[in-house]
């Protein structure tokens, strides 16, 4: 994909961000369940229960099943991360040194992102010291541009994220990556793409011949490939939560209801009429010991009792 002008990038953003919004919503729900913030915590109490003095308990028990399953999966797969063997001992050692100590953690991060979002993304680059770097990227930020062929080819990547400027204004930043360069754009979060999108000079480059540092909206990476690698959670790119969310919600509802019932049992109100005893302590003692209490009765019309 060649360099895009401002109008083309506006069209690209509008065409793809709308469809990406559904993925963001689902990912945020999965991440919320991963953090043990299940739906049960946000359900409003029923009006009829709120007005019932005998139904005061409102415990919300959120179960961390999704987080436990995802962490177990990531640990099982990447406690010992994949090894590279190119049949050369020195080269294998060099690869291990380049990948560094963060390799296992990064693998787990990508796995967790894929489990929550359906796909995890790895970004790689060359830093200012000319060293190879890589990191997991929040899947909600990445909008892939695929070809329409049967063997889908990654034509470009649109990375979208919020950024706070030095003057305290919030911007939406759009990075468009192809196989040779990255173009940067931004707009105020409060503005629209059509009205507010502009080139963003976020990259700093040093010109050797003139020894001048200049700002640019374009960064040449020259990898010859788009420096983002997708890792799909499964063949249909669904999250791990999709299969278990109904079970988790039912468990939370039943368990929370059970705890509420146990607590509400203690809220029973006794109305005593013509009780023969002299104190409430005696009444509760008889009720506990004999499961009955004695009351006076003054005839058929008398409604003495509890």
What are these regions (language model features)?
Residues 1, 9-13, 21-24, 29, ...:
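Extended hydrophobic/Leu-rich segments
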Residues 1-142, 149-152:
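Extended, helix-rich architectural segments
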Residues 7-10, 14, 39-54, 88, ...:
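Short charge-dense sequence patches
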Residues 111, 116-117, 121-236:
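Extended, regular secondary-structure scaffolds
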Residues 206-306:
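Extended, charged amphipathic alpha-helical segments
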